[in-house]
Amino acid sequence: MSKRKTKEPKVETVTLGPSVREGEQVFGVVHIFASFNDTFIHVTDLSGRETLVRITGGMKVKADRDESSPYAAMLAAQDVAQRCKELGITAMHVKLRATGGNKTKTPGPGAQSALRALARSGMKIGRIEDVTPIPTDSTRRKGGRRGRRL
């Protein structure tokens, strides 16, 4: 009988982020979509093709009514910042979005607190841009001819 060859386990070094020099910033793009029902915080690479982290306010709280709250957005943003630090991202460009279209163009209550939580957690903020879709000639808004009657 021949002796069985044992394979030595290969040691792989896993680098989550890009290799950078000391003091150099690694940028990601954080897309904050704040509606009045939920707040989405979605981090991609600079091209926007590769999703790195995506967390919503609804993933952080139990009650449905609290999904869009500033508290849920703050918890989600802290989670996102921690995950980004693990991946090696140190700075972010922010793209803030409201519902837009023929609906409301003002961001929901979680937008400001999410942005503040990202900044307070040690992330450097690059550009802040509003990417709410604004129609040039909109479709008709819901509510009918006489509007919503309260």
Swiss-Prot record:
It is found in: Cytoplasm. GO terms for cellular component: cytosol; cytosolic ribosome; cytosolic small ribosomal subunit; nucleolus. GO terms for biological process: translation. This is Small ribosomal subunit protein uS11y. Keywords: Cytoplasm, Phosphoprotein, Ribonucleoprotein, Ribosomal protein. It comes from the Eukaryota. The keyword ATP-binding does not apply. The keyword Coiled coil does not apply. GO terms for molecular function: mRNA binding; structural constituent of ribosome. Signal peptide: none annotated. The gene is RPS14B. Belongs to the universal ribosomal protein uS11 family. Pfam families: Ribosomal_S11. PANTHER family: 40S RIBOSOMAL PROTEIN S14/30S RIBOSOMAL PROTEIN S11.
